[in-house]
Amino acid sequence: RILLQEHSRFLHRYSVSDKGGCGYLMEKYYLAVDIGASSGRHILGHMENGKIELEEIYRFENGMDHKDGKLLWDVNRLFGEILNGMKKCKELGKLPVSMAIDTWAVDYVLLDEKDQILGDTYGYRDHRTDGMDAEVAKILPETELYARTGIQKQIFNTIYQLMAVEKKTPEIMKQAKTLLMLPDYFGFRLTGNKLSEYTNGSTTQL
């Protein structure tokens, strides 16, 4: 569930000037952005005397928004919090050489041909997936699905979320060009690179 990203764009936008002296730091720092369902934090790590030293530099609250009976994630706010923590690195004069973004599993965004998010970004606790397991089973029996993926059936798995999109808002599915899991989406916003990190991708049951 961890997506490693090179930080070239981060350095371009938030680098400290050489006059400040921070450009000559020899210490190598690595940034982990750990986002959970109720909070997120930025952790800087570095090696000191042969040991890994960890430092929490930024923390923020998280949670699903209730809107028109739906449970949704505000991905723009979350991305803003990621940037806030990165700016904190600049304030501390501790620029990471690389970073990773980690969130919960199964939730995703669909992007159109212009890389804009289609529809709402649902949270895994939303009930739109109720009954979608039966719809998937009409196409692929549960035993065969498990044989292919080896993933435990959970009604919030991405496969059932996508079936809900197909059944309830098919126009969104027709416009969709890319699916990105949430950590991969944030990484895309930072780097411009689209990819699917294997371990998080395995939680989709796809």
Sequence positions of predicted segments:
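Residue-level signal for well-ordered alpha-helical scaffold segments within enzymatic catalytic domains
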Residues: 84, 88-91, 134-135, 164-168, ...
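Gly/Ser/Thr-rich active-site cleft segment
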Residues: 35-37, 50, 145-206
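Hinge/lid segment of periplasmic solute-binding proteins
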Residues: 130-141
